[in-house]
A protein has these predicted regions:
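Membrane-embedded alpha-helical bundles that constitute the cytochrome b-like, heme-associated redox core
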Residues: 1-207
Length: 207
């Protein structure tokens, strides 16, 4: 992308960017702590690591709830409509081609991955709160589910499946960022500065 053909737009608001990074940090902590807890199973640090895991889960829960709300009342680029592009998805599937034009706001194809990730994170939050209550007698559901030992067997498999799916999303997300960066497309910077860098030569789509 040549600098002469680049349009710079301020698109992503500060709260959206802050929530993005809180969610990202929470997910990294959750992944790391779950693996460390397995590595130190039955060791002196296992309980402390699981407590960190639960705290990171609270952080993800709060940030995800705020993001869901901000998607309803926030500015245009933060709203759920900005992630919902069924016509573009149908056209891309029909032609087996990605859209050529850059779009102001979230990329329509990447939006599918984001919606998938939000769905997986919701599953992780619900199952995680249930597991924290039934296994560790911790969290807001402990008063109701603290003695429901049977719930561990019900929630453990969905929680672990969500972990695998989330790990796949993180890997795909990082690979896509590297790919765009190698092509000279400054996608990663958008969630730092709030600015979107659009290639005018490819066309800029407005909704």
């Amino acid at each position: 992308m040549s600098h002469s053909s680049t349009q710079v737009r301020r698109v992503y608001d500060p709260l959206l960017r802050a929530l993005h990074w809180v969610i990202a940090l929470s997910v990294v902590l959750l992944i790391a702590s779950s693996q460390l807890a397995e590595a130190f199973e039955h060791g002196p640090y296992e309980t402390a690591i699981w407590n960190l895991h639960i705290l990171a889960g609270y952080g993800l829960t709060a940030a995800l709830m705020a993001r869901l709300l901000w998607g309803l009342v926030g500015p245009a680029s933060a709203r759920w409509q900005d992630l919902w592009h069924p016509a573009v998805w149908k056209d891309s599937l029909k032609r087996l081609r990605l859209p050529n034009a850059h779009r102001v706001g979230h990329d329509p194809i990447a939006s599918l991955a984001y919606l998938f990730a939000y769905g997986v994170m919701t599953l992780m939050v619900v199952s995680g709160l249930g597991l924290a209550a039934s296994e560790f007698q911790a969290g807001p559901l402990a008063a109701w589910l603290g003695n429901a030992g049977w719930l561990e067997d019900v929630l453990e498999d969905p929680h672990e499946a969500g972990f695998v799916l989330m790990l796949g999303f993180v890997g795909l997300h990082m690979a896509a960022l590297v790919f765009h960066q190698l092509r000279g497309e400054r996608v990663a910077q958008s969630m730092v500065t709030g600015k979107q860098y659009l290639d005018a030569e490819r066309g800029v789509q407005h909704d």
